[in-house]
Amino acid sequence: MIILETRSLKYSYPDGTAAVQDINIEIKKGKKVAFVGQNGSGKSTLFLLLNGTLKPQEGEILFHGVPFKYDSKSLREIRKSVGIVFQNSDDQIFAPTVYQDVAFGPANLGYSKERVDACVQSALEYVGLIRLKDRPPHHLSGGQKKRVAIAGVMAMEPEVIILDEPLSNLDPVGADEIMDLLNEFNHFGSTIIISTHDVDLAYRWSDYVFLMSNSKLIGQGTPAEVFKEQELLKKVGLRQPTTLEIYHEIERRGLAYGRNSPKTIPDLVNTLKPLDLMWVDVAPGVREGDNLNIGVMYGEYATQSPYEAINATVLHIHPNGRAIVELKRKGIKAGGVLLYDTDKYSPDEVRQIIKEGEIAFVGAMGKKSKTLAEQDGIRLDVTSGVIDKSILMALCGKRCLILTAGGMVDHALKRTREYVDKSGIEFTVGVVNRDGGCKWLEETEGSPEKLKT
């Protein structure tokens, strides 16, 4: 379903500078969309048009197929449904306290005092700032101000959230927290639209990319489609994403499997084609290209796990009856990624899981989970890029625990299971405290073994 659409959109500033020229786009509901381009390419002006802050001089914008109207009542409905977070949070935050700033939008929509309070409390809880609700915004850090601005938009319960350069002026930890929030909003159905000149962010995060230059739309498609066009990227002063650049170099050297375009470091690692050959005796009648079950290897013959089930493809058969085969290994006992929902948090339970589950690597996603771990002295090995780093550790046979909450639990579960399905590399994935019980599942030889507390 198309939620936002523009038709032949044009806008120029009073001095005659063309900011948006003949823009035609369709944005699907529930997608993560990135507008990519250098500063001055027209992204920010387009966002102000999509929110009804500016009115186009030509063309039209449609929300759920209905053209925008620019009377006061219609604009109020548009801005309730299509929220915008500016690049500079100071341009958006003006009230004496955090609570009052977040309450401004719902109050302006005519909500009752009780509903305004419920919306504000919920939004501040969601972004992890409820304890700062009475603090003046100018006393906050850059990352906290950004979260206040996001909470102000969230409190109006929009279907679409637009963010202009959402990670500008944020440190890596603050940036990771903002992206966790955006992923959670999207998980619950919100359409998320961002502008950025960071090609690495757009490539790994978005479902769909629009490429802008000199106030025009010059390309669009999936991240893999857009960022493979090296000549187009050079034309607008952008480079290929680092992960894709490394993959193409690996592919040119014949060291990569398949023709997928990896988005993340675990995806990239999974494309590597190891040289794993062996001489084996084969039975009469075996032909080149046949698949063989070699059995289980261990000790010095198992290179990735303590015990490995080995299948092999016959590459060449020698006249003496021996063959060169390419080995395909599968660890019988691999690591795993375990998720703990901190909405049901117990520090003693977490410590017991870490001890009895032999957890070697602990991460936390979201401000709430990080704060809980820190205040209770629970060791955190990683607080940014948590999902990818946990997958990499699981591939090395380590058991990992991710502390998170809300929609990020299902988001992390989905991301990790997608990796397992796509890569074909099996390791345990699950939520440890869902449905009232603590469970660590070791899926070995088809018989789950459960650790319960």
From Swiss-Prot:
ATP binds at residues 37-44. CDD domains: ABC_cobalt_CbiO_domain1. One of its GO terms (biological process) is cobalt ion transport. InterPro entries: AAA+_ATPase, ABC_transporter-like_ATP-bd, ABC_transporter-like_CS, ABC_transpr_CbiO/EcfA_su, Co_trans_ATP-bd, ECF_ABC_transporter_ATP-bd, P-loop_NTPase. Pfam families: ABC_tran. The keyword Metal-binding does not apply. It is an enzyme of class 7 (translocase). PROSITE patterns: ABC_TRANSPORTER_1, ABC_TRANSPORTER_2. Probably part of an ABC transporter complex. Responsible for energy coupling to the transport system. This is Putative ABC transporter ATP-binding protein MM_0462. It comes from Methanosarcina mazei (strain ATCC BAA-159 / DSM 3647 / Goe1 / Go1 / JCM 11833 / OCM 88) (Methanosarcina frisia).
